[in-house]
């Protein structure tokens, strides 16, 4: 998120309530900006709500067209991209945090909006580690709530299988646990 300046006066929406979206929402909320996390999974949205972050399901959020200064697309789905553009105000910034997975097209996107409304599009990867580590050290970002399951290293193969299952956020391997 270092490639975009987010100020406390900004309205920011994050699309996607997976690991990436939850982390982005927490980091953005620290700026003081009005932060909305949009997702489909009640249990994941509750994680953000416990941190004081506003949440919506996609249908409710869709009513807030052209309201946001910055929209972060972290769902990895073409529909997330389309929805992000609909939420963005003219001269807003669309941040792409994930690549699109699986089938689907973004043909429904009104490409003229990028030009007419002067939309900025920013691709954003993981960024520098030290600022992230500093936030973790201060306890500013809650990562414990993102750990769905823990396993000893001896069960590593099973843990890897579990990590790929729907609904599992993060799986933690403890090398010295039994």
Give residue ranges: language-model regions.
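Mid-domain Rossmann-like dinucleotide-binding core that forms the NAD(H)/NADP(H) cofactor-binding site
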Residues: 1-60
């Amino acid at each position: 998120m270092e490639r975009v300046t987010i100020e406390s006066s900004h309205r920011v929406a994050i699309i996607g309530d997976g690991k990436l979206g939850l982390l982005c929402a927490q980091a953005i909320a620290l700026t003081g900006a009005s932060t909305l996390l949009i997702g489909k999974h009640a249990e994941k949205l509750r994680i953000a709500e416990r941190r004081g972050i506003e949440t919506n399901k996609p249908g409710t959020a869709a009513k807030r067209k052209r309201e946001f200064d910055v929209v972060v697309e972290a769902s990895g789905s073409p529909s997330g991209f389309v929805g992000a553009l609909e939420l963005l105000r003219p001269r807003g910034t669309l941040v792409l945090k994930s690549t699109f997975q699986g089938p689907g097209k973004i043909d429904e996107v009104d490409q003229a909006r990028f030009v007419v409304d002067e939309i900025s599009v920013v691709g954003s990867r993981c960024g520098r580690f030290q600022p992230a580590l500093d936030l973790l050290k201060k306890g500013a970002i809650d990562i414990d709530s993102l750990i769905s399951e823990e396993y000893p290293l001896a069960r590593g193969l099973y843990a890897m299988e579990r990590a790929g299952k729907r609904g599992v956020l993060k799986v933690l391997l403890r090398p010295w646990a039994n």
